[in-house]
Amino acid sequence: MRQSLLSATGQSLNLRDNGFNVIVGQRQGKTYEKAVEDGWVPGETLFGIEEACDKATIIMCLLSDAAVMSVWPTMKPYLTAGKALYFSHGFAITWNDRTGVVPPADIDVIMVAPKGSGTSLRSMFLEGRGLNSSFAIYQDATGKAMD
């Protein structure tokens, strides 16, 4: 993952602070302004969702269940062959008949699900602690999903 360009829609500070090559995709508004306050630079590390998804090799969907469903139509066209889609929880993908979140067959789909909120995860990270997580591979199109 360290060699990949990660696009995060949602929580991303821990990735940046751990040295990952990460950009943020946000819609204009409060969350975009918050990202700027957190040090993300428009046009360098902060983009609209479409541009961030287009640039990335791993597209991280780190949003609430409701937000995943609303942003899915925006993200889906950028899930091209060989990319990976990363979730932080499994509702949208597990209940895809209800959410409409059906990834293309030629991408990897993985999940790393912390056992707590993004806020808790960030607080614990800043304290030098971690949080238990579950890991799953939903789809391994490239044979590299475990990497």
Please state what every model-predicted region is:
Residues 13-19, 54-57, 131:
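Short, surface-exposed connector motifs at secondary-structure boundaries
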Residues 86-147:
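Rossmann-fold dinucleotide-binding core
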Residues 48-101:
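Rossmann-fold NAD(P) dinucleotide-binding segment
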Residues 1-43:
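NAD(P)+-binding Rossmann beta1-loop-alpha1 motif at the extreme N-terminus of oxidoreductases
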Residues 21-23, 57-60, 83-84, 107-110, ...:
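Structural motif
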Residues 4-9, 29, 66, 85, ...:
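Gly/Ser/Thr-rich loops at beta-strand to alpha-helix junctions
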Residues 39-50, 116-117:
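Glycine-rich, highly charged phosphate/nucleotide-binding loops
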Residues 14-17, 38-39, 74-77, 99-103, ...:
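Short, glycine/charged-enriched secondary-structure capping and boundary segments
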